[in-house]
Swiss-Prot record:
Residues in compartment: Periplasmic: 66-68
Location in the cell: Cell inner membrane
GO biological-process terms attached to the record: negative regulation of chromosome organization
Name of the protein described by the UniProt record: UPF0208 membrane protein YfbV
Lipid metabolism keyword on record: no
Gene, per the UniProt record: yfbV
Family membership noted in the UniProt record: Belongs to the UPF0208 family.
């Protein structure tokens, strides 16, 4: 995935962008066959909730049973890295420019929002997945569900 040239995205801001993207993306069942975000967001939220206790349990279990500390630490670090991997992927995806097929659909949804009387900020540069998430979130609130029939 490539990032737009006009934005400087460092490693740590990708986590923040991923968190924002996961909160912005509408988790609608009709989007799941086309976009992988629904699955990634659900699994990332699951990992954020359950992987830290699993990491602590793994360490405590190995220490209590007198096992080796090295494999326990490696397993705990792997468990702790899973939520970070999900947030990093979502952050990277949020700044990825839209492919041509989705770009056309993005402009159609924006057009339908504008036809319904919504005031939208102009798109700066090439739209990315974060712009799509913002537009879809607004479309699900303002429009009826038939705007997805073209997808």
């Amino acid at each position: 995935m490539s990032t737009p040239d006009n934005r400087s995205v460092n490693f740590f801001s990708l986590f923040r962008r991923g968190q924002h993207y996961s909160k912005t993306w509408p988790l609608e069942k009709r989007l799941a066959p086309v976009f992988v975000e629904n699955r990634v967001i659900k699994m990332t939220r699951y990992a954020i909730r359950f992987m830290p206790p699993i990491a602590v349990f793994t360490l405590c279990w190995q220490i209590a049973l007198g096992g080796q500390l090295g494999p326990a630490v490696a397993t705990a670090l792997f468990a702790l890295s899973l939520p970070m991997q999900g947030l990093w992927w979502l952050g990277k995806r949020s700044v990825t420019p839209l492919p041509p097929a989705i770009l056309n659909w993005f402009y159609e949804v924006r057009g339908k929002l504008q036809e319904s009387g919504q005031v939208l900020a102009p798109v700066e540069g090439k739209p990315d997945y974060q712009a799509l998430a913002d537009t879809l979130k607004r479309a699900f609130k303002q429009l009826d569900k038939t705007f997805l029939d073209d997808l």
